[in-house]
UniProtKB/Swiss-Prot annotation:
This is Chloride channel protein 2. GO terms for cellular component: actin cytoskeleton; apical plasma membrane; basal plasma membrane; chloride channel complex; plasma membrane. It comes from Drosophila melanogaster. Belongs to the chloride channel (TC 2.A.49) family. Residues 663-723, 1048-1105 form the CBS domain. GO terms for biological process: chloride transmembrane transport; chloride transport; renal water homeostasis; renal water transport; transepithelial chloride transport; transepithelial water transport.
Amino acid sequence: MVYFGDRQRDRNRDRSNQKVERIIHDEEFGEENVELVDSEWADFEKFICQLRKRRNSAMSMEEELRHVQRHPKIKSHAFYPCPPPAENARDSDSSDDDDPIGYIDTLMYGRYTKDLGEFAKDEARKLKILEKRRKQEDKQRNKELLGKHSTRAKRVSSWIWRHTVARLGEDWVFLALLGIIMALLSFIMDKGISICTNARIWLYRDLTSQPFVQYIAWVSLPVCLILFSAGFVHLIAPQSIGSGIPEMKTILRGVQLKEYLTFKTLVAKVIGLTATLGSGMPLGKEGPFVHIASIVAQLLSKLVTSFQGIYENESRNSEMLAAACAVGVGACFAAPVGGVLFSIEVTTTYFAVRNYWRGFFAAVCGATVFRLLAVWFQNADTVRALFLTNFTTEFPFDPQELFVFALIGLVCGLGGASYVWVHRRYVLFMRSNKRMNKFLQKNRFLYPGFLALLVSSISFPLGTGQFLAGELSTHEQVTQLFSNFTWSRDDLTVEQAAVVTHWMTSYTSVFGNLVIYTLFTFVVSIIASTIPVPSGMFIPVFKIGAGFGRLVGEFMAVTFPHGVRYGGRLSPIMPGGYAVVGAAAFSGSVTHTVSVAVIIFEMTGQITHVVPVMIAVLVANAVAALLQPSIYDSIILIKKLPYLPDLLPSSSGMYSIFVEDFMVRDVKYIWHGISYQKLKEVLKLNKTLRSLPLVDSPDNMILLGSVQRYELIKMIEKHIGREKRMEVAQKWQKEAQERALEEEKKKQEVELKMRRPSRFEVLPAPDILSLRQIANDEMLPPKKRAETMHGSLAPRKSILKKTNSFNLKTYAQPMGHSPSITPYTTITGNSEFRIRSAFEAIFKKSTTLQDVQPDPETGSLSPAASNHEVEVPRTPSTPGVSKKVQLPAQSNWDFVTDQIMLQVNPISTESNKMPAEKDFTDKALSNNGDSSKQSPSIKFKANKVADVNRSPQTAKRCSKIRFANEVGVNGSPTRTKCKIKPENVLGYSIEDVDETTNPESLAESIQKPKSVRLPRERVIDMSPEDQKQWELEEMLKPIDLQKANVHIDPSPFQLVERTSILKVHSLFSMVGINHAYVTKIGRLVGVVGLKELRKAIEDINSNSFVPPTRDEDADEKPAVEKPLLSTNSSDKAVDMTVTSMDSALSNSENCSDIEMEHIKHTDKGTVSLTMPPQESKQSPSADKSNTENGNHA
């Protein structure tokens, strides 16, 4: 308030002076400009007030941090005991702007514009925030750099793996385990699906008297299961929605899809698929099983990687994923051979033959265990096929029928292409309707519930479901479609008639039901596949083809009731064979695979129709491939997954378009001799790049190799990390100690040279200090008083120079806190010594004072004294530490020492005691109180009495007792340890006692020995200012990659700039690379990744690719592109940073891993702030391409 009052008076005085000046000005120049002057002066005063308010207002946290970083203060030595060796530190008072508390020089006295208390609180708050950020970023850096730490459990697991599984063959055990796990999952899921389906049919059949209740029971269960599956999948892992084969096809191509191979996705996929198929919706499980097997393989690889590093290799991981795809199909249909071939056709374009045995072995293990589980738990008589058929093997078909089979393949090819087209158009229609799409996104359960209700209502057996065999499950429907008797025949057995009753009604015949069933499955499967739940597409199209083939077979049986004549022999028509051919042809046309023929043979257990099946599948594939892509490629296009498409044969530009037409020219690179600061800038600005090309210099751009991002970050961490910083801090401390010792030595030498020897003895005159000392000595115990008297009777020291004519006597050892007394001690030194002695006397007096309210039980020795047990009270090391001291601490300590010496040598000890000491000892022994309640004590148990006639050496050795006062980090006492050396022959056993004043804890601690915990070692680190300055200097140094032991890939994949896009596509597809560097005569000119190649191929296939115009002058230049950092920029003018994550100055909200400060060094060595330069604007395509290349490098 006084401060603001002074400011107000000064302001009024200034205004009065200014008003007088304005009056004089008006009298001289007239009154016409008075109003103008007043308005201008009012504006000026308003501006000054705003300026003062802005100056007096406290800066925000970000501004304060920037202020501190821009103007480093003088280095602190209060809490960091290791100053840097540089002595030309910047003075904090060199500039007025450097004063953080706003000191202003006035006419008489200085004045502070800020509250010191608030300033201290702000500083403490900033330090707390910086420390918190430092710890968080330290954890992030450890996670990125340090990787996995080896633990004892991992080492044990590694040892067990090496001596058990590794000896049998790692891949064999891994693949067998993968197959067994998938078989178990498939069996469990089938069991759950059958339970849901049987429950639905049981409810329908049990409520025959009430049709409406039957309808409710028939509809409610599918709706509930679909809603549960949709909600569960959406909450746990939305990545599990759909088939999974398109995603696996993309992943095996080298693209990393986030969260698609995690444990959460596995749980959501298994539970969601079980609920979906249990609802009775026309969906399949083959695609989801491929995804599930891939997830299991990925999780097993991570498990094995923890104690076997071979599975960390990306190529080995992709091999295991390829085998997992085969296991998924094999465990789903018990078809190992067809599963391997199907997974190869569906997921990969170029397959490595070395993975064949892996896929076959894992698929055979899975299929075998899956069928054995059916024998063990489903009462199967033996290992059988999934859809067992019993076609006659003598004449299964006639050659004339091959034409009909080919016709079935042609129709199925057209139908498969139309199926894919309708599916894609329906999905795009649902997406294009933005209003409906927005409404369905807000109401996620409305669309799945409505479709489930619609499909189950249509399939209700008492309604339209009687035309669709609605009472049958999917397995029963396929089994009956594959039956080897003619449904339209009149002479049917009871079992055959029971089968036909599901496929004909009183309103329709077998043909009508088959047509309705095929069309219904065709339409509903397309609609149901859009429900956001895990589902497959293979079983629905398999059923569609089986229904169409059965329809053709029944038509052939009616047309040729006696069979087809060939070579004088009639062969009967088997409609079941036509159903098998139709199922293989339609599913092959939709998936664009030929291996479905092998799957059909394994599922039916017969190869009687191998020729018709192969002919139909080939014709259907040929027709469908010309019209539409496969269903999985169509989903890739719909989801816009980053998969590399194929070049169409009709593309005319595949030979005239080169890699230089679509490569990225803005390449991020490093070079030999790059500084650590520039390297970190490159890493910071390109966080998604996992490798960087290495060139010789920014001028020549000769490609020398590539370096992984992890290696570069580890190199920076090694250069200025915590270990390096601690080493430098220790070195600085050592140098500081050496300098301090040298300075002290020089100072003593100078003092000795300046002092002149005297022949006289300097004696201090009696003063108040000496009188106070005498008064304090009288209050001391007898022994200490005798020692003080003995010390006072010692002869005074002479200050004369020691020569041959003088013999100085031996002087007593000085006290612990007193200065060393030399023959040249002056009066000042003696005065200081007397002052310290006076304070020590006061402290000793405080330790001997009685408590104001003494304990009535105080003053007696513990009962253990009668059993030769002695309690040794501890004297507090610092006055005032112990809150309650009942006995004179120093007297008790002398008493204990005398008791030990008495047992060692009682004769000599008793004879050497003074009378006062004997009286005190006798008085102390006469007490019967428990001294353990008074102060911390140490108990000595005399197990055997020592011999009286011991040597003085033994007595001296036995009396050595060591006390280790352990003090914690904050100065709090922890525990006290006391022991006698092992060579003690008395047999004393010393117990550790906690230093505390609680009697109960003391009693417990005396009875039970406790361990001793050593205090934490003090870590010597730099101050934030020193650390910042040191890191700035270290970051300016150039990098020597050879000394840094950085692993450099000397042969990264390179392409010449004139390589055609056809060769680039073939190389990327066969080799499986994700990016390649483009060179011109050895110089790096660009980089191409999957994104650029895919975009170019799509444009070429659509005839919309426009090659960029080439600049002829640019080709003549030696350097095609300007480097990321200009070559003329020196290391002294680049952006500086504090890299270490545990630095207090390396935290910022706008930078996640590495904070960068922008400063420049002047010629004088001072640091001045510069604004960060604006980043060069890149095209969006370049940024995206670099991001994608980094993700797949």
